[in-house]
Structure formats: C-alpha cells, structure tokens
Amino acid sequence: MNITATVLLAFGMSMDAFAASIGKGATLHKPKFSEALRTGLIFGAVETLTPLIGWGMGMLASRFVLEWNHWIAFVLLIFLGGRMIIEGFRGADDEDEEPRRRHGFWLLVTTAIATSLDAMAVGVGLAFLQVNIIATALAIGCATLIMSTLGMMVGRFIGSIIGKKAEILGGLVLIGIGVQILWTHFHG
C-alpha cells in the first residue's frame, strides 16, 4: 500500500472518532484545548492499537487465505465503509443527550474502543496485504489524534451540521480504498 493510500486510510479510519469527538465537544459548554488534546490522545492511542490487534489475528489465518487477500480486504473495506455511511445517515443517538460536563477517562476509553472496532477489522484485512503495519497503525493513530482534538474544539460550533457527514465521508474513503485495492490486483 502506497503512502497516499495509507494517509487516506488513516484519515478515513479517524472519521468515526472525529464524529464522536464533535458530539463530545458539542455537549461541553466550552471545551478547552487541554480537554480536546486529552480526548485526541485517548482516541489516538486506542486507534493505534486496534489495527495491530486485528493484523495479528489476520496473520494467524493468512497462510490459509493468501490467494483471497485482495477480496478479503475489498469486502471488509466495503462493509465497513457502508456501515459508516449508514451510521452517518441515521438520526442523532443517545450520546448527544449527555449533560454538558467534562467527560471521564473511562467514558472516553469506552467511546474510543467503540469507534476503533472498524480499525481492528481493517487490521485483519491489512494482514493479507504487503503493508508496514507499524507505520500504518501509527498513521491511523496520529490522524485520529489530530481529528479527535479538532473535533472536540469545533464540536460546539458545527456538531449538529457536520457530525454525521464526517462518518459518511469516512465511509466513502474506505470504499474508495477497497475499490483501489481490487483495481490494483486486477490491473497491476
């Protein structure tokens, strides 16, 4: 996977966390930069670890399905991208109803894990491709740190407008990467 695909994947994977951070930022009266950075660090750390875990799980099965690697990555990315798009079109969830208060550490960790399950599944798919998983996981984590911090800071201003659109954009990016993987396999 080339650098462009890695960066697109990283920012595509960060869109769930970005959308969640916008929601979190929108529930706080005036989120401070330190609160936003704390959220970004938690989301980024979790989002760095989950593709590594998924990659490890995928490597255990790689020798059995190596000839199907491009199809596995394609189907996973299409599925995850489609799920993100569907979530983006759904109405506001209970998370938007939280009181305006500082979010606790464990609530942020739980939210980060929930938004990073896609990254774990992508990690499984990446096990079947020739990628530097450490660099890819770090790119995903850094993109998530940036996008989550940014999402918290702008959440109170645009939470109701762009929150779900960010998930739609992330889903489209994942689908695009899936199509690119399949295209590259067949057209070299």
From Swiss-Prot:
Induction record: Up-regulated by MntR in response to manganese.
Keywords: Cell inner membrane, Cell membrane, Ion transport, Manganese, Membrane, Transmembrane, Transmembrane helix, Transport
Ranges that cross the membrane: 3-23, 66-86, 106-128, 143-163, 168-187
Entry's localization field: Cell inner membrane
Keyword Transport part of the UniProt annotation: yes
Disruption of the gene: reported phenotype: Deletion causes manganese sensitivity and leads to increased intracellular manganese levels.
UniProt record similarity statement: Belongs to the MntP (TC 9.B.29) family.
Protein name: Probable manganese efflux pump MntP
